[in-house]
Amino acid sequence: MNHSPLWCKITMMNEPELIQAAKHGDLEAFNTLVLAYQTIVYNTALRILGDDNLAADAAQETFISAFRALNSYRGGSFRAWLLRTVTNACYDELRRKQRRPTTRLEPDNEEGDEVETPRWLADPNASPEDLLDQAELEHAIQHCLDDLPTDFKTVVVLADIQGLDYSEVSTIIKKPLGTIKSRLARARLRMRECLQSFRELLPAAFRLEKERGI
């Protein structure tokens, strides 16, 4: 999974100091954390919600809520703590969307921000000539994610796209570990079946895997 250089620098050097400073009201420290995590938070929201405007709203609400709740952070993975916050913000957006239906907008990547893909679809041999196919594949992935129930979609996004382990996902969505494993297995199967309708866009390794019946 790719992360921004700023995110990597912060996690290796001074994230705990920034968090402590932000807890004491240092807005510059908090803004540094926002810059480091904004892409991860936005991409998570976009995958769950499938709408760039809703994702932007959820990301904004995530950081507002995070700032207000910083004193409740007791250590551990700050990234996982933020992903729990953005997951809750996405659920809030979905509830609001049900009350006031909106026109769905297709997600895009015009700004060049990273759009991470599930590990099982990663193509390590991608070349510059594959960029167009990769963009089409991203739309295929989002299409199949949007066909999943929200509970299934959320575990796929957290585990396969953001790379959290099962216990972290269990903590974030407040469900037993067995439930997480069951949902993820069923969601992965449905994703694979759905993506077969976009077979020509799949990385070669995935197509061969399917042909062998794996």
Positions of PLM-derived features:
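Hydrophobic-face residues of short alpha-helical interaction/recognition segments
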Residues: 41, 45, 70, 82, ...
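C-terminal edge and immediately downstream basic/flexible tail or linker adjoining helix-turn-helix-like DNA-binding
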Residues: 2-11, 21, 102-104, 119-120, ...
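Arg/Lys-rich amphipathic alpha helix in sigma70-family domain 2
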Residues: 72, 87-105, 197
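A short, charge-rich alpha-helical start-of-domain segment used by transcription regulators
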Residues: 19-41
